[in-house]
């Protein structure tokens, strides 16, 4: 609520939103923060007064057909699904906001309602959820091939692959989905493995026991799926006694460091 009142309408969030500049319906200032504030301002007086149905001063036919503040739903009537699904989660709006308003949390929470309560989501999101549930990565590549990139890049002999090798290690390498299945990121993974080997750092890699960190599921609103993936990874970390983790994937780094603690 304080975020809504804190907005000074400077438009910096709007100016830096990539979705807005590509013609999407999302406008962090207008279609999210100010829309929610207008909804709150219109609804709160009637809730406080206990009025069953507010009397609206109608001045036109369009207004005569308008949904009353008490009947308006935050989702659909105020903030539409099209607006919510246009967000890329880049956080540019928050980075440039002088009032430190947290736009993204509001968008994710509303997505969570759409996904977990309404069952209303784009086909692409549903496909990603299915892939994460079955193969533990957003692309649906077979989970049993998660460690194949080591052989492809010729570095299998440099890696303490768990549980096959299970030698003592100081650090656990968390590769993430992109390193396992995307050709460009495989090269980045290879570079890091060779660097760690050259530096004499003793590390282990989970391979097929590793699963997606869950970040895509949480950002898309499927909190249950995120919790399931996170719980598995945490239990696996504990299983091998990993207390120092090196992340290649930036999403995995942020999720494991900042969100698994929650």
Where are these regions (language model features)?
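Iron-sulfur-cluster electron-transfer modules
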Residues: 4, 30, 39-262
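Carboxylate/His-rich catalytic cores and anion/metal-binding grooves
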Residues: 17, 29, 33-35
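Non-transmembrane accessory domains of multi-pass membrane transporters/channels
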Residues: 1-25
């Amino acid at each position: 609520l304080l975020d809504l009142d804190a907005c000074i309408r400077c438009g910096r969030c709007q100016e830096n939103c990539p979705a807005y500049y590509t013609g999407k319906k999302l406008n962090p200032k207008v279609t999210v923060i100010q829309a929610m504030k207008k909804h709150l301002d219109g609804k709160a007086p009637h809730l406080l007064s206990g009025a069953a149905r507010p009397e609206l001063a109608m001045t036109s036919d369009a207004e005569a057909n308008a949904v009353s503040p008490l009947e308006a739903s935050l989702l659909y009537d105020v903030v539409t699904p099209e607006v919510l699904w246009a967000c890329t989660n880049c956080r540019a709006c928050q980075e440039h906001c002088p009032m430190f308003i947290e736009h993204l949390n509001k968008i994710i929470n509303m997505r969570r309602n759409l996904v977990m309560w309404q069952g209303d989501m784009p086909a692409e999101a549903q496909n990603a959820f299915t892939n994460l549930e079955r193969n533990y990565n957003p692309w649906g590549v077979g989970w049993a091939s998660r460690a194949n990139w080591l052989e492809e890049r010729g570095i299998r002999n440099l890696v303490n692959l768990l549980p096959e090798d299970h030698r003592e290690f100081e650090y656990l390498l968390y590769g993430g989905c992109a390193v396992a299945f995307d050709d460009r990121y495989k090269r980045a993974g290879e570079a890091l493995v060779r660097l760690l080997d050259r530096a004499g750092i003793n590390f282990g890699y989970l391979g097929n026991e590793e699963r997606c960190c869950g970040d895509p599921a949480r950002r898309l609103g499927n909190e249950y799926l995120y919790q399931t993936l996170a719980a598995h990874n945490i239990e696996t970390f504990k299983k091998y006694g990993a207390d120092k983790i090196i992340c290649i994937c930036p999403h995995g780094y942020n999720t494991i460091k900042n969100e698994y603690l929650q």
